[in-house]
């Protein structure tokens, strides 16, 4: 029954060239950026499915734009559900996704970005465990850029999404402040990173293509096979990014 499940919703955009990962253009082309978006989405969804084999999770894609249902139906693992789009802006999308999933009767809700394909599966499992413990709380996964890659809730708290400077380095800090204002305890997960600019793309490439001993890597993450395969192809075909993407097995 849904009240016994944690609804884990990926905040997902369909891979339409020119509308996704535009901060990576250049060095990527708009088409390459769209292909990277698809690879990341696929890996994040498979990661959620992996976590669902270890914890009481129902996977969702809170998708945008309207009319892209077929794209997600073809991409998502079996058992995933679609959450129709409400708003194009990040803050309102998060707010409405959380509200709608609680209204559907789920016992807890976790919203996760689609930009962290190597997020360790155990962080998703840990989130459900934290949300199953007695007492109200919010679970936050801080991102290296000052935002968060995940927010988990036991109850809907609209205040967590208000007065936030979205898409800035202040998001995580402001969300902590909003939680304090309403007396809501915060459980903090390990830091991870989003892939949305050249620096983080380089970090992703080092993690997936350089091996576990590469200096400066986030180690122990999800293998992200679709994203790794895309990066290997990219390294062979786009001369503008070859210096960013090491060959597999080299530091």
Located regions from the model:
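Short phosphate-binding loop-to-helix
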Residues: 71-108
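Short, glycine-/small-residue-rich phosphate/pyrophosphate-handling segment
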Residues: 158-176
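Short beta-strand/loop segment that forms part of the nucleotide-sugar
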Residues: 57-65
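Short aromatic-hydrophobic micro-motifs that form the base-stacking/packing surface
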Residues: 110-112
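Conserved donor-nucleotide/metal-binding helix-loop-beta segment in metal-dependent transferases, i.e.
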Residues: 119-145
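N-terminal nucleotide-binding beta1-loop-alpha1 segment
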Residues: 1-23
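Conserved alpha/beta core of the MobA/IspD/sugar-nucleotide pyrophosphorylase nucleotidyltransferase superfamily
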Residues: 177-251
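A short, N-terminal amphipathic alpha-helix
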Residues: 37-55
């Amino acid at each position: 029954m849904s009240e016994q499940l944690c609804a884990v919703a990926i905040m997902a955009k369909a891979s339409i060239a020119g509308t996704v990962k535009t901060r990576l253009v250049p060095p990527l082309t708009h088409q390459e950026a769209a292909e990277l978006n698809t690879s990341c989405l696929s890996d994040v969804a498979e990661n959620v499915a992996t976590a669902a084999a270890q914890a009481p999770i129902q996977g969702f894609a809170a998708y945008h734009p309207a009319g892209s249902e077929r794209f997600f139906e073809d991409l998502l693992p079996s058992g995933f559900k679609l959450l129709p789009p409400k708003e194009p802006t990040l803050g309102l999308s998060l707010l409405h996704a959380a509200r709608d999933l609680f209204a559907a009767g789920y016992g807890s809700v976790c919203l996760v970005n689609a930009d962290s394909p190597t997020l360790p599966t155990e962080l998703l499992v840990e989130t459900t465990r934290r949300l199953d413990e007695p007492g109200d709380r919010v679970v936050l996964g801080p991102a290296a850029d000052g935002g968060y890659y995940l927010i988990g809730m036991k109850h809907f708290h609209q205040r967590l999404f208000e007065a936030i400077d979205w898409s800035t380095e202040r998001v995580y800090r402001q969300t902590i402040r909003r939680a304090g204002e309403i007396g809501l305890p915060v459980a903090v997960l390990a830091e991870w990173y989003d892939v949305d600019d050249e620096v983080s793309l380089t970090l992703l490439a080092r993690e997936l293509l350089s091996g576990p001993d590469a200096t400066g890597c986030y180690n122990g993450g999800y293998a992200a096979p679709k994203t790794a395969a895309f990066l290997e192809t990219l390294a062979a075909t786009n001369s503008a990014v070859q210096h960013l993407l090491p060959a597999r097995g080299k530091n």
